[in-house]
Amino acid sequence: MTKYALVGDVGGTNARLALCDIDTGEISQAKTYSGLDYPSLEAVVRVYLDEHQVGVEDGCIAIACPITGDWVAMTNHTWAFSIAEMKKNLGFAHLEIINDFTAVSMAIPMLKPEHLIQFGGAEPVEGKPIAVYGAGTGLGVSHLVHVDKRWISLPGEGGHVDFAPNSEEEGIILHELRAELGHVSAERVLSGPGLVYLYRAIVKSDNRLPENLQPKDITERALADSCTDCRRALSLFCVIMGRFGGNLALNLGTFGGVYIAGGIVPRFLEFFKASGFRGGFEDKGRFKSYVQDIPVYLIVHDNPGLLGSGAHLRQTLGQYL
């Protein structure tokens, strides 16, 4: 008889829940709920379990915020809860709450070739460290290492490292953003809001007044080639994505590959392919040869957060991935 676990991927707006086959890792019965409609995460879980009538005693839910202890307070939502109390209330034997990019990193061993698009480099080296990052509402970062037949995710807040420009144009961007924001992290330029900041900085550096644009507006105008400033912003975004990925590769020697997740890049995939992304990735001066063979992949799986939550839980329960 198939045994299922509950898996989830929770952001600031929506909570996506599903069932995971503990033996195979297969994800099924996925459903998305609006977080605005429920007073707590536990309430959403109860609705899902009532709707599906499956006996579940184990769960793993990925959440877009730092997980540092039993108390979880979402940074982009009003939900806050005790993991131990929620586990007790639901009657679960196991309940894991993990960072969203921990989940994405744990999905990588489960991905198939059709879930990936490669951008340069050679083949990944088996057993070597892996980096994963992705731009969305913010900039998520994680690493993955293989130790004693187990995958270990190394979570952190790498998106908040300093923005490190490496060209005259990028230096001008930093100057403009520092005047507006004070501290300028990588996330301030590599995210949806970051694309807007890039556009604004480009326009303001030319002593002009920027329009009040949303990330979608900038992307659409760039792809239509109807706005030079928007196209420059999107081009710069791609190059800086490359530089940041190359930095991750250097930090941990990620010869197992660098993986890009998040919802932004797939929206302009052809533009990204033709951009200066790979050039930015390899632009490491004396260490260019070190990163040249490291492959970069774009994850095109529909929901790596659910897949990775399931993988994390299965490994916790003693399975080998």
Swiss-Prot record:
Keywords: ATP-binding, Cytoplasm, Glycolysis, Kinase, Nucleotide-binding, Transferase. It comes from the Bacteria. The keyword Disulfide bond does not apply. One of its GO terms (molecular function) is D-glucose binding. Belongs to the bacterial glucokinase family. The gene is glk. It catalyses: D-glucose + ATP = D-glucose 6-phosphate + ADP + H(+). This is Glucokinase. It is found in: Cytoplasm. The keyword Acetylation does not apply.
